[in-house]
Amino acid sequence: MANKYVSSVLKSLLVLLHLVFLSKQHVDSASIVKSLPGFEGQLPFELETGYIGVGEEEEVQLFYYFIKSERNPKEDPLILWLTGGPGCSAISGLLFENGPLTMKLDVYNGTLPSLVSTTYSWTKTSSIIFLDQPVGTGFSYSRTQQFNKPSDSGEAKRIHEFLQKWLGKHQVFSSNPFYVAGDSYSGLVVPATVQEISKGNYECCNPPINLQGYVLGNPLTDYTTGSNSRIPFAHGMALISDELYESLKKTCKGEYTNVHPRNTQCLKFVEEFNKCTNRIFQQLILDPLCETETPDCYIYRYLLTTYWANDATVREALQINKESIGEWVRCYYSIPYNNDIKSSMPYHVNNSISGYRSLIYSGDHDFEVPYLGTQAWIRSLNYSIIDDWRPWMVKNQIAGYTRTYANKMTFATIKGGGHTAESKPEEASIMFQRWINGQPL
């Protein structure tokens, strides 16, 4: 009787161990993707997709796209790319900003949209992990309803955990120079993530991540500084009159966002400002404000991506888990999220003290996060200038302006650029390649 009981217990334990093994296999799934629906032929680069579980029970499943450098992946830098939002899929970076593929701009006719190769991919000289985060973004999901609500500071910890596990399974990249990069809202999360990785390198984690620095494009950094820069930017771009600008300066005294209710004069002029600018395309003021469904609209490609990413053959090729979220959306803006970092400037200071390099770039026609606000917070850090304001060139033409500081921070504008690198892909790529290779812009 006792033997039967022991035998029964052992069988139960074996079943449980088998289930745990399958669960771990499921959590840590990764697939090499040789071809993608919509792209003709084999992919001309190495693509891996997969999930890494984070959290106490690995309940949060973070989906990633990993593309190896086309030059020398054994030695080239490894970049982690975080798209803004929060809640915007990493596909935005991969297909529209710095990846080796993009959508072909054809009128949608009910068939699967096509993909084409790009010329100015950052993966020419760097390997990039494009990460869907926070949970609920892109193809990332939770296996239970019991998980902590994502937050800026919490994401820094989750991303660090993701990296530790990812590098544990890709140890060939553990010694590569590592950088965290992103744009827009990631201006709050990336500096915090860099600090978290740096802290982990000293306190807990072996082997340490070979962290070298970070890259940020048009980064949200400080809510007040960023918002207050919109009015001087609008004046400089001839979107408002001299008279309105002078009235705003006089009555608001530089505070255009959190205006006191009793300051009725300021509120009146702010309303006039809004009337002058509310029909401007915020992300690139030179482009028309148009409907997504219009094929000649700049953002029509986003609609095509939605059709592509929701196709069953695409999901199968990417090896998307069936228990993942249902419909894929490029940006899930209603994602439950706690915006608990109001300013990332203290993180920039700490990262500078730790000696990390940084590249901060701004498209100079972005109205969402104007370059003036970015210049203002960088200036407030009060680091000495070692290479003063000068043009940087592409093909003997001015591509933007740059300045380098003693804390290893390089600031650059991209002339004619918008909120993301997709508006000026050649200039953005050349800027990145020069900086990542340690060359002056």
UniProtKB/Swiss-Prot annotation:
Recorded GO MF terms: serine-type carboxypeptidase activity
Tissues in which the UniProt entry reports expression: Expressed in seedlings and roots.
Glycosylated position list: N109, N350, N382
Localization of this protein: Secreted
Disulphide bridges: C88-C331, C252-C266, C290-C297
Gene Ontology CC terms: extracellular region
Summary of the function given for this chain in its UniProt record: Probable carboxypeptidase.
Family of this protein: Belongs to the peptidase S10 family.
Annotated PANTHER family: SERINE CARBOXYPEPTIDASE-LIKE 1-RELATED, SERINE PROTEASE FAMILY S10 SERINE CARBOXYPEPTIDASE
Name of the protein: Serine carboxypeptidase-like 1
Organism taxonomic ancestry: Eukaryota, Viridiplantae, Streptophyta, Embryophyta, Tracheophyta
Gene label: SCPL1
